[in-house]
Structure formats: C-alpha cells, structure tokens
Regions:
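Transmembrane alpha-helix boundary signature
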Residues: 49-57, 73-83
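Intrinsically disordered, low-complexity non-transmembrane regions of multi-pass membrane transporters
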Residues: 1, 28-29, 75-110, 239
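Transmembrane-helix boundary and interhelical-loop signature of multi-pass inner-membrane proteins
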Residues: 18-31, 48-54, 153-202, 209-217
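Alpha-helical transmembrane segments in multi-pass membrane proteins
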Residues: 7-19, 23, 39-40, 44, ...
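Structural signature of hydrophobic alpha-helical transmembrane segments
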Residues: 1-14, 61, 128, 132-145, ...
Length: 239
C-alpha cells in the first residue's frame, strides 16, 4: 500500500496552514533569510544529484532538448495561468490575510519555482519510486519533515495558496510509485543516475530563481525529465 505521498501532502497542507496563520508574526528578516537558505539548499541538493550522472553528454542533451521543447510549448505560461487560477480558488475557499508579495508577478514567479521544488525534487522522485519498488517510505517521511517547514515559511508570504501545491506533488509521486513496478525492470543504474542528474539541474535552476539571482524558466525545463532516461539508454548503447 502506497502511503508516503499522502503523508507528504499532509505535511505541506499543515505547514501552509500554520504559516498562513502566523503571517506577519514571523519577522521579515527571518522569512527573507530562510527563503534564501531554501534556495541555497535546493542548489546544494541539485549539485549532489548532478554528481550522480554517468553520461554527461546525455544529461546535457536532455536539458537542452527538454528546454527547447518547453519553450516552444510555453509550459511556464500555462503553469502561470494554472497557478493564478489555483490562488484565486484556494483563497476563496480559505480567506487569507493580505500577502506580503509586492505583485501578482512576484507571486507567480515564486509559486512556479516552489511547485518545481516540491513536486520534481530528486528526493521526492526517488522516494516515490523507492516506495513503489520496496514498500519503504522512509525517504518520503524525511522529505515530509523538510516540506512542512518549507511550506510554513513560504506561506507566510504567499498565503494559504501554498497548500494547493500538494495536488501536483501528490499526483507526480503517486504516478511514479505505482508505475515503478513496471518501469524499474527496464531501468539501468546508468539511466537512473542520468535521470537524477537532470533533476539536479532543475533544482539548481529553481534555487537560483528562489534566491532571485537568475530567473530561469524552470517549468520550461521539465520535459528534460522525460527525455533523460531514453537519451541515457541511447547514449550508453551506441557510444
């Protein structure tokens, strides 16, 4: 029975509710500094994930082709619209105090970045696949601890809308967990390493975005995740 993704979802909802309730009670300097730390942690974890690559050319090609596809499909623009709709829907259901965000554009920018950080992190992906294969959900429990505090801090500025992130995250994790049984027999260690490395690249980009260092179109890079394993397999076979 798969339970890890649902525990992770409850952690996000709980953290978001507490953070939205606390709001301005948390000092601005603490919210700002912790947001920077979350971005730094994202980049740090991303670097560790990138180090797992087996075929660097396959990793780079996946990121390049995936980003081109995402840019042509305007994925981030679509996610922005969904994020805006979700924000309005959630705030109607759970009235929130005025957000400290300076603009809707700033809200969307951070919202998209944390959707990627929560839903497509290497920890979540590996944890979901690991539970599907072995039934061990310890990795997702650890991720739930981290996500609880991350959601709480982000909700102090983004509001209760952060709770809605549990929807894409749970969807991704449940699909991965239930499909792992069918996928893993065909996945080599090399493919797994290159897949983790591509996810790490996205986490680094998300970290830069959260820290407002460089506004990568992270959502437009998502197709790279789906290209990573096929390209890795092709490269290992014919190189």
């Amino acid at each position: 029975m798969i339970i890890g993704p649902y525990i992770n979802a409850l952690a996000i909802i709980g953290g978001a509710v507490i953070g939205a309730a606390l709001g301005g009670r948390i000092p601005e300097r603490l919210r700002t500094n912790l947001t920077l730390i979350f971005g730094l942690c994202s980049m740090g974890m991303g670097i560790v994930m990138v180090a797992k690559t087996t075929n660097m050319p396959a990793m780079i090609l996946s990121v390049l082709l995936g980003t081109i596809i995402g840019e042509l499909l305007l994925l981030e623009q679509g996610i922005n619209k969904l994020a805006s709709s979700a924000k309005g829907l959630v705030e109607k259901m759970f009235p929130d105090k005025p957000s400290s965000m300076n603009s809707q554009e700033e809200f969307l920018s951070k919202f998209v970045a944390i959707v990627v950080l929560f839903s497509f992190s290497g920890t979540g992906i590996f944890g979901a696949m690991n539970e599907g294969m072995s039934g061990n959900f310890d990795i997702l429990i650890v991720k739930s601890f981290l996500d609880f505090f991350t959601a709480m801090i982000f909700a102090t500025s983004l509001g209760i809308s952060v709770a809605s992130i549990f929807v894409p995250q749970t969807l991704v994790q449940v699909i991965l967990a239930y499909s792992a049984v069918f996928i893993i027999p065909f996945v080599t260690p090399e493919m797994r390493g290159d897949f983790a490395a591509v996810g790490g690249m996205l986490m680094i980009a998300a970290g830069f975005r959260i820290c407002n260092i460089q506004m990568f179109h992270v959502a437009n890079m998502l197709p790279a995740l789906f290209l990573a394993m096929p390209i890795s397999h092709f490269w290992s076979t014919f190189s």
